[in-house]
From Swiss-Prot:
The modification Isoleucine amide is found at I39. It comes from Centruroides limpidus (Mexican scorpion). Expressed by the venom gland. Belongs to the short scorpion toxin superfamily. Potassium channel inhibitor family. Alpha-KTx 02 subfamily. Keywords: Amidation, Disulfide bond, Ion channel impairing toxin, Neurotoxin, Potassium channel impairing toxin, Secreted, Toxin, Voltage-gated potassium channel impairing toxin. This is Potassium channel toxin alpha-KTx 2.18. It is found in: Secreted. Has the structural arrangement of an alpha-helix connected to antiparallel beta-sheets by disulfide bonds (CS-alpha/beta). It comes from the Eukaryota. GO terms for cellular component: extracellular region. Weakly blocks Kv1.3/KCNA3 voltage-gated potassium channels. GO terms for molecular function: ion channel inhibitor activity; potassium channel regulator activity; toxin activity. This toxin is only found in female specimens. The keyword Ribosomal protein does not apply.
Length: 39
């Protein structure tokens, strides 16, 4: 899932991703935007 959060590293994406998927969230930073996935 792509979310509208700007990023330079995956660490910045983990908190918003955890809000969506809980503690089983995976976070990536692709093209300056956060991508969340459920692990």
């Amino acid at each position: 899932t792509t979310i509208n959060v700007k990023c330079t590293s995956p660490k910045q994406c983990l908190p918003p991703c955890k809000e969506i998927y809980g503690r089983h969230a995976g976070a990536k930073c692709i093209n300056g935007k956060c991508h969340c996935s459920k692990i």
